[in-house]
Amino acid sequence: RDVVEVNKRTVAAVPLVRDADGVYRRDLAALEETIEATGARLLLLCNPHNPVGRVWSREELAALEEVTARHGVVVVADEIHADLALPGFATTPFASLSEAAAAHTITCTSPSKSFNLAGLQVANILISDAHLRRTFRRELATTGYSQPNTLGLTACRAAYESGDAWLDALREHIAAARAHVEARLERIEGIEAAPCEGTYLLWLDCSGFLKAAGLEPEQLDEVMLNEAGLWLDDGRIFGAGGEGFTRINVACPRATLDYALYRLETAVAAVT
């Protein structure tokens, strides 16, 4: 939101809807109504979704494509977690749906999440349409940032050409870590993980804990930091739908994860 508003644009939020099983889905009717009401010309798509961890199915993306194409909306597809779908799921790049979809899509990827290269600040912007590509290059030129750093380029190429073994091992580690956290959360009253299909992040619903402890959603981050000693991501930074949620990164050594879970369990027991 901050980046959009700094660029003097207006955010037209369309919250995801959580079903009875805790799975997040898009409200396409609400999306279309918002596009018609606001005249929005660009949609930011997170695929897989951060923070809720959905790996959108081809059918879901095709339905989204119908709406955006009908209204001439450009889709900026943030697919930085595309490599990190969990076993049983696979990321479908939005632009791969069809040539028509690719024509109004700007795809953003990077080796930073998959290969732990965020510090090198390198990413890939894929634009099939010539007009969109010219527009992007023109805007890029106005920033004065026209060339990525040499080390980042070298690392990016090495990761994509020679990083298969690393990525396979990472995916196994993340899947095991996620299952481990979900099992441990069964011992912690009032906190549960939303069903997750990808990324190395878990979206934790803490509403039960807050209710039991008599706390307000805005106090959650304070409890996590001061009582549990954990610096997690307050769900509110992701919008109103994040109230009562927090985000945790499971891509770390098992000992680190276990210590964090111990501190979380201890703090919840003490507060409630």
Give the role of each language-model region.
Residues 1-272:
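PLP-dependent class I/II
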